Amino acid sequence: MDMVTVLIPGGFKPPHVGHYKFFMHYINNPEVSEVRIFCGERQRKVGDDFAVSIEHTEAILRLYGILDNPKVVYQRARVRKGSNGHYTNPFADVYDWAEENHSKTENQISLGLSSKDTGYQAGFLSYFKSFANIVEIQHTYEQEHLVSATEFREALAAGKSIKEFIPEHVEEEEIIKIFA
């Protein structure tokens, strides 16, 4: 059986239960030997007084158990220089990783997506199909109900309950401590 490396780009500010289930969907897939998460550094703010940083994201992913999973390789998106200054683009990093590593890995490579982002898969496949062992994973993660990182940030900033935004094995207080 050919094994698959799944590449997942995103901001994840903050990572919510939908992200958790999305990552676990690929981690628990027996055909997947590696899940590579590329995370952008741009903060997401609520007003002037509350922001979610990449450090918050990493602490939450660790709390969820994602970063400690042996299948997961996590990396911050590379800082790039553009006409408007420095920026990160985790989606560009996924393309760069596939270009740089497709001939070095025995694994097939796939883009990890939720059901709301399937258009990206077509572009990824089209770009790489002529020279790399890129596959489409037919079992794109289907979200049973949409959870919003924006609403999660707003609830955190307002001090409201965040139970609906986090996995069942995590306590609200653990997340709140990260932002204290």
What are the language-model segments listed below?
Residues 1-180:
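Nucleotidyltransferase catalytic core that binds NTPs
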